[in-house]
Amino acid sequence: MIRRQNSAFNPKLFAFLIHSFSYLNLPQYPQRNLRVISVITGEIKSKIDQIWDAFASGGISNPLEVIEQMTYLLFIRRLDEIQITKEKKANRLKTAVEKPIFTPEQDHLRWSKFITLGDPTQLYSTIANEVFPFIKSIGSEDDTTYSHHMKDARFTIPNAALLTKVVDLLAAVPMDDKDTKGDIYEYMLGKIASAGRNGQFRTPRHIIKMIVELMQPKPTDTICDPACGTAGFLVAASEYLNEHHSTEIFANPEAAKRFSEETFFGYDFDSTMLRIGSMNMMLHGVENPSIENRDSLSEAHSHIESQFSLILANPPFAGSLDYESCAKNIQAIVKTKKTELLFLALFLRLRWIKLKNKLS
């Protein structure tokens, strides 16, 4: 974590920075009351493991595909929870439901409705032929980030027996507490980490929270993760802003629009990660972040710079690139094929553009 001391960019400093992080005089931040880390119980982990085993027995063993299909189902469940909250508020205020997710004609598409069907064949037909197309269409009228990445989404659970088992197991997992939801999802993402696909290793959620707390993002920040994966850093930043600056970010329609559309930027070249990241952001109230399919290290995208005031990221620590495929302005900072060092060079380049930018 480095704060910029002056505006003169000197690429030769990079080698010094790489070898001297432990000797830097890092800024001192006031002591903060970081939130207590909640840990899911062994019973909940066992339920998630049972779901994982069910997918494997049903012919889906790719960890990323399992995560993707489970995310769709969790997303569907969360949409119903949001609708229920809206309905309770409307009943309390004696008003109409504000921006309902489901119309009365779509009531049967809600999680709380279809899990009571009882007939596995009918359940499969409802989810595969109605619910999944419904979640793919959300935001399509406005061509949002979410709808863009969902265009190629596929429902790959092959049969009614597997779907019924997975839905029943997921329904038994308690998700009333926000931290528990996050811990459950982190535990699921740990399955990707154990697979080690394409250098995709999750950053533990409590580490992400700590970094965001130290950086103290503000409503005026433009926040970027050039290797965003499932958008964990961006989600944590949005939660921080909601908790500490809710009055400012929702002060008026223009401020709310800026928060939703002009604050968060994430890049990744894995389409599955982009879909999961978009859903993750949407579930946390950021409806249209700029999450794009980009290889941040490539020459084709060497222009991404200048608009970011805060970089939050954990570089991939696996793999290497050919010199020819890497952006020249990154190679000018460090001559290496290692992706973790190339990403550090990218972070420094992005951070160095503006005075007082921050990097963590």
What are these regions (language model features)?
Residues 2-4, 8-219, 290-299:
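Non-catalytic, mostly N-terminal accessory regions of nucleic-acid modification and defense proteins
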Residues 49, 164, 257, 287-291, ...:
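Short acidic (Asp/Glu) and glycine-rich catalytic loops that position anionic groups and cofactors
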Residues 57, 172, 217, 243, ...:
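Secondary-structure boundary motif
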Residues 66, 70, 274, 336-360:
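Conserved Class I SAM-dependent methyltransferase catalytic core
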Residues 190, 239, 353:
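Glycine-rich, acidic and aromatic/proline-enriched surface loops and short helix-turn segments
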Residues 200-313, 318-320, 329, 341:
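Conserved S-adenosyl-L-methionine
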Residues 322-336:
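A mobile, often basic/glycine-rich helix-loop segment
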